[in-house]
Amino acid sequence: EIRLSLVGSEMCIRDRANGGTVTFEESHFVVQPQISFSVMEQSTGYVKVLVGGRGDKNTDRGLNRATDDVARQPGSSIKPLVAYGPGLDTGAITLASAIDDAPYYYSGTDARLVKNYTEGEYLGYITVRAALTRSQNVPAVKVLTQITPAVGFSYLQKFGLSTLVSPQNAVNGNHDVVQSLALGGMTKGVSNIDMTAAYAAIANKGVYTKPIYYTKVLDSEGNVIIDNSIPETHKVLKESSAWLLTSGMESVVSSGTATRAKVSNQPTAGKTGTTQFDTDIWFCGFTPYYTASIWVGYDDNSRQVSSVNHTSIWRSIMEQIHSDLPSGEFTKPEDIVEVQVCSKSGKLPVEGLCDHDPRGSCIITEYFAADNQPTESCDTHVKVNICNVSGDIANTGCTSVSTRILTKKPSSDSIGSNDSGYTTRDAEYSITEDKLTKLCTLHQRASTSSTNSNSGSTSTNNSNKNNSTTPTTSASGTTNSSGSSGSTEKTTKHN
């Protein structure tokens, strides 16, 4: 869809005759939606391409949407810079960290429900890599909350974003040290070139380089009067953190929200960003050679009809730039290791549990910084014995029992049974901690102690009239339990 917007008019004298003046109105229109595009060579900081807009250039020193003070909201393209990058760099998370994508509210006075782009869809336990790939909002907000918005804000400063608003410089009481910063909720927004320079820092092994538009200025005699050839640089991320973040964003391009951005014959990493009503659409990404950002939107913030073409435009431009370049690679640092983990906990897998999840094995192989690899075993998966009649923890008197492997959650809120009205996709495979201690009261327990050989847990007989005994949990994470409609592993009947 192409629209035209009137940005100015001029009354011009066309003819003079018989003492009268005939005039006409000359109008200039700007094609909409508009675009900005910038390309940097991350190894040098050289700015190679600047596109400030669509349409014919009809004025000198006109608006340049790539560099001028035309800040736009970045949407999810900010997530790697403010949440996941800092989280990896501080050791707060790994790419395998399991975050519960469930109904979640901002804290304090801003008690709004955090919604995902696909409204009402919550996936349950999801790794950081998967959350980044699918651009789920709740995990990003939870990560920023964990590291604190102040830390995320400080990283954005190091990434060179020039439009940030600190609490000390609040505009009408608004500033950027807030949880919603994880989703691009900024007071002013960002510029295209700032986003390109920030992503170039990730591509440059964590080192930020201030964009260089020229290297020197000569006088009429060829003497250098301004030397701009020495780049201004500083460290933002550890090399291992930058590589891990790059690996996560490669998944965004290979199987996530930016599959159309894949540059032929080059590894490609990046992140999409879309604001409410599609008023701002972004893709920021890089290859081993160049980093580029594209923004598409209406100058008057009108809603856009489609948001899929921007990644194709990005790819088309980048493929021309790379046409004569050999295939590169994102060189893996020596302190990166591969470890098998459980995708529902981010920890080392427990045999017989993590590999027997009713949805399929949850054992995955993930990359880690050597100094931040998991050492603890999964404590999310549990094997539970459930009374098929009451749905509670089976006691020794229950005659129909199902053995299931479920994932443990802290409360009913984490499976959506709160006032949000939503449920998580993994609800039927989950059990809350309170239900792990709720024993079946419909059946009389057997008069002698019995040990459940299927789960490795023991139910102990006592004289408690309400049949409520606390179930024991074995070292393997097994317990007699209840409260799910998940797949049955084994059903036993006690006579």
Question: Which stretches of residues belong to each language-model region?
Answer:
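Short active-site loop at a secondary-structure junction
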Residues: 30-35, 58-81, 96-99, 126, ...
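Low-complexity, Gly/Ser/Thr/Pro-rich intrinsically disordered linker/tail segments
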Residues: 339-454
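Mid-domain, small-residue-enriched loop/turn segments at the edges of structured enzyme/sensor domains
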Residues: 112-117, 148-195
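Ser/Thr/Gly/Pro-rich low-complexity, disordered linker/stalk segments of secreted
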Residues: 445-495
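Short, well-structured active-site flanking segments
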Residues: 78, 88-107, 149-151, 206-217, ...
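A penicillin-recognizing enzyme superfamily signal
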Residues: 3, 9-10, 14-41, 50-51, ...
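Conserved catalytic neighborhood of penicillin-recognizing serine enzymes
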Residues: 93-152, 178, 220-251
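Active-site SXXK
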Residues: 45, 73-99, 131, 198-202, ...
